[in-house]
Amino acid sequence: DGRTPGNRTADPEEATNIEIGLKAVFDNGYVNIALFEQSIEGFQSNVFGGTGFNLENAGKETHEGLELDGMYALSDDLVIGFSAMYIDAVYDEFLNGTCDATGLSDPEFACPTGASTIDLSGNSPAGIHELSYNVNATYSFSMPRGGNGFFRVEYLHEKDVKLADLIPFSIAKRGSDNLNASLGFTSADGEWDAMLWGRNLTDHESLISAFPTPAQPGSFSGYPNAPRTYGFTLRKNF
């Protein structure tokens, strides 16, 4: 227990994974699909204690879900890829979860008098997206004077998820609706690569992490994602 003075260690986690799936390969691509269940006994958690975070074995956590990925070549030059995941995650047992010290959550989750933890059994863990998916397309082509090029576009969606236990979505959440694209070239001799790229072209705003601020009751800290970003990369191969 990391809350015990002088003890900064925790016991190992014990994970049990069950998965059943199907793989299909055909002329122009493939599809993989899997159902899974993961159970973690004694999962390690950084529990907030008011003045800092303590690593401890918190109980049992279960993830159940569906995973799908595949690729399909529409032609020799154009390839479509996709992946998706659905996860139902729950704390089966979490007796010493971080209680709400911000006053932003429901009163039932407020810190009890003289305590800094609360029973979160039955609640959903923070930071695990219930649904996420990625769709991408890559078009490859030959240059008139030799060399090769490609154009790639990708869309990523991650359903909004809370970033800290008991802090509402409206205060601290993470999600993605990002469009990325790149245009690249390789010289005929393979010595030079050049790529023009853009990330988060939708300029989607979200936090990537958030947590209660140590020694400042009623407040929290967070880090935003990168805004719309453009760049050019030139590489010499030896």
Pin down the residues of each PLM region.
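Solvent-exposed loop segments that connect transmembrane elements
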Residues: 1-8, 43-56, 92-123, 165-167, ...
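Phenylalanine-focused residue identity feature
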Residues: 26, 30, 36, 43, ...
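Flexible domain-boundary/linker segments
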Residues: 37-39, 50, 87, 99, ...
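Gram-negative outer-membrane beta-barrel transporters
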Residues: 37, 57-165, 235-237
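Membrane-embedded beta-barrel scaffold of Gram-negative outer-membrane proteins
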Residues: 9-73, 79-81, 85, 89-95, ...
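Conserved C-terminal beta-signal and adjacent last beta-strands/turns
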Residues: 12, 16-20, 123-238
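Residue-level signal for the start and early helices of compact helical domains
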Residues: 1, 6, 20, 27, ...
